[in-house]
Amino acid sequence: MPLSSPNAAATASDMDKNSGSNSSSASSGSSKGQQPPRSASAGPAGESKPKSDGKNSSGSKRYNRKRELSYPKNESFNNQSRRSSSQKSKTFNKMPPQRGGGSSKLFSSSFNGGRRDEVAEAQRAEFSPAQFSGPKKINLNHLLNFTFEPRGQTGHFEGSGHGSWGKRNKWGHKPFNKELFLQANCQFVVSEDQDYTAHFADPDTLVNWDFVEQVRICSHEVPSCPICLYPPTAAKITRCGHIFCWACILHYLSLSEKTWSKCPICYSSVHKKDLKSVVATESHQYVVGDTITMQLMKREKGVLVALPKSKWMNVDHPIHLGDEQHSQYSKLLLASKEQVLHRVVLEEKVALEQQLAEEKHTPESCFIEAAIQELKTREEALSGLAGSRREVTGVVAALEQLVLMAPLAKESVFQPRKGVLEYLSAFDEETTEVCSLDTPSRPLALPLVEEEEAVSEPEPEGLPEACDDLELADDNLKEGTICTESSQQEPITKSGFTRLSSSPCYYFYQAEDGQHMFLHPVNVRCLVREYGSLERSPEKISATVVEIAGYSMSEDVRQRHRYLSHLPLTCEFSICELALQPPVVSKETLEMFSDDIEKRKRQRQKKAREERRRERRIEIEENKKQGKYPEVHIPLENLQQFPAFNSYTCSSDSALGPTSTEGHGALSISPLSRSPGSHADFLLTPLSPTASQGSPSFCVGSLEEDSPFPSFAQMLRVGKAKADVWPKTAPKKDENSLVPPAPVDSDGESDNSDRVPVPSFQNSFSQAIEAAFMKLDTPATSDPLSEEKGGKKRKKQKQKLLFSTSVVHTK
């Protein structure tokens, strides 16, 4: 062991004196070169040279004593801890530790567990082994055999150049936006004093949350408050889309010292001012086998509102809240202040007052009263705005009339002074005729402008109309004639002018109750073949649901289904295939599309099989984790390999007994030759159906006496005189022959599809061996006859190959 330097010994003694320990004797002994044995109770000798790790031992020998003097004797404790901690890393500094001795003694004592005083104990706590065990956060996903990537992140290389491709990858998952999903799948009642032109031009434009007065949700089940687990009273919805009772969410927000709190479901920020009124309506959830009614819808190209063909109208302005016929087909419903007061605020007020009467003596009553107070504030604001709005509306209307009438009167005065008097006088006659058809009291200048616009309208529309026709034809080819063009002219409008051409329209079938369920293209092609186009198809059809496929609107889906381009992104919809029957479509039409219908049927069956197999595999894996393993299934259908005792003893049609002991395997009374459960089943059920027809019933005592098989003693008494004791019966095909397995697939499932199942190796191997033995047994029965007739010895036959696993035989 190398000796410690005097400097190290002196420094160590100084540290011991400061800490109040008595280690002077150990220090003197160490300076003489004698290393005393170290006991378990005493601390490690700090005077000795500190042992470095295996990594540092070779590096420390490179330096001599002259190198030691270059280091300062007294270095701060933090620098030593930093150097010591860096030695455990992969790229540690191979410089030897400081020869100071004091800190090295503390470092060694922290790992060897020696007793220290209180001063050293406080310093040693900083050198805990956890400080050198690597990072504090350890990924243990490999122990769970499970990996999870957060949704919306396409790559792990954030902030580096290596992950740039993942961000540009168009096949990656798009980040999920809660607000976009909420606004795509809900209907909003908004205040009418705002401009919503952009929302009727682009379906993906988000509605300003401050303009929302009420949110309407259509779901298959009534939501419940996640706090009280009851149907929400005076329900409020957050911006993240979660619904709560108004009193419950106020109670939850009051628990936080901040003005906002995290959502108890998704941990998004929830502000009190962002809570909006919500109404949830329950809709019927259609499943396979239900009868659904779909109606024919019509939508002009470029318009985002699709209406039933029977109720179709030009959607020139947004639909208001009071329009009950068309309100379910629009995303935005404009409401006035009076409508918000009567249809939103008053309903919540009644619900809160009823809840307060029921829970007046509960701790929740204070939050119900707070909700009522906030509702009164909202009511006062709406009523005040409504009163002031009436006054402002009257003033604005008067100003608009003054502004509009002044230039019109001025224009009518200066029109006769224009240069081309002949054209104006000739055009004036037509203007007066048209005006006489409408209202004679209207000014002459206003119809003049409208007439000029109407006359000049067809000229620039010629080229766009042709382009629309070509684009529409492409849509029909891609979508199986989903949409058709409306070529008929519109009737005369109120102003007396006719629209010479109309834009193309999309026709499609949607669920009658307004759900986003649309007809499958296969059914659409059947209807187009039957009626010529969807425009001439029935307005409503009813049929049985065969398949429902759910989708979420994306850019790719929007390009494939252009007739659904009015749906916003992330909007959920479903394509429904129906079993159309006469009289909706004729039998000839169904026969024409029978191949497509059968193909889709086989695809559904295949998908169902794969799902069942997957469920079975998952169930087996889960059972294996719990120590439950599947039972071994041994097929006992072959009666020759597994003979049953009942089947031979209870047959009354022929004599009982085996055919031969060599060929087909003789049936003996020994229990070893029977199947395991045949004897027990026979004893437990002596009155079987086969035995009751005339065969004698057996019991335990008379089994040996009444048995038709001769015993061994009887065979000895008879001797060789009567050798042919066993009666020979013709082998039955249903007992001795191989029973072909049922036409099932490898998993034991069958269907009417044309798929050929893969044979099991176990069954094919056993059947091949048994068939080979049967072939050998067949000529053995004819040997006595050939010997009697010919009297000659048979020639030695060549050996036959029983079974071979190889496919190609080469010499």
UniProtKB/Swiss-Prot annotation:
One example GO MF annotation: transcription cis-regulatory region binding
Supply one GO BP term. ribosome-associated ubiquitin-dependent protein catabolic process
InterPro entries under this entry?
A: MAG2/RNF10, Znf_C3HC4_RING-type, Znf_RING, Znf_RING/FYVE/PHD, Znf_RING_CS
Its recorded name reads: E3 ubiquitin-protein ligase RNF10
The keyword Cytoplasm appears for this protein: yes
Q: Which gene encodes it?
A: RNF10
Top EC category: transferase
Give the Enzyme Commission number.
2.3.2.27
Instruction: Answer whether the UniProt record assigns the keyword Nuclease to this protein.
Output: no
Q: Which GO terms describe its cellular component?
A: cytoplasm; cytosolic ribosome; extrinsic component of postsynaptic density membrane; glutamatergic synapse; nucleus
Q: Which reaction does it catalyse?
A: S-ubiquitinyl-[E2 ubiquitin-conjugating enzyme]-L-cysteine + [acceptor protein]-L-lysine = [E2 ubiquitin-conjugating enzyme]-L-cysteine + N(6)-ubiquitinyl-[acceptor protein]-L-lysine
TM region(s), chain numbering? none
Q: What does this protein do?
A: E3 ubiquitin-protein ligase that catalyzes monoubiquitination of 40S ribosomal proteins RPS2/us5 and RPS3/us3 in response to ribosome stalling. Part of a ribosome quality control that takes place when ribosomes have stalled during translation initiation (iRQC): RNF10 acts by mediating monoubiquitination of RPS2/us5 and RPS3/us3, promoting their degradation by the proteasome. Also promotes ubiquitination of 40S ribosomal proteins in response to ribosome stalling during translation elongation. The action of RNF10 in iRQC is counteracted by USP10.
Top-level taxonomy: Eukaryota, Metazoa, Chordata, Craniata, Vertebrata
* Bias type Basic and acidic residues, positions: 724-736
Q: Where is this region: Disordered?
A: 1-119, 653-672, 724-761, 776-811
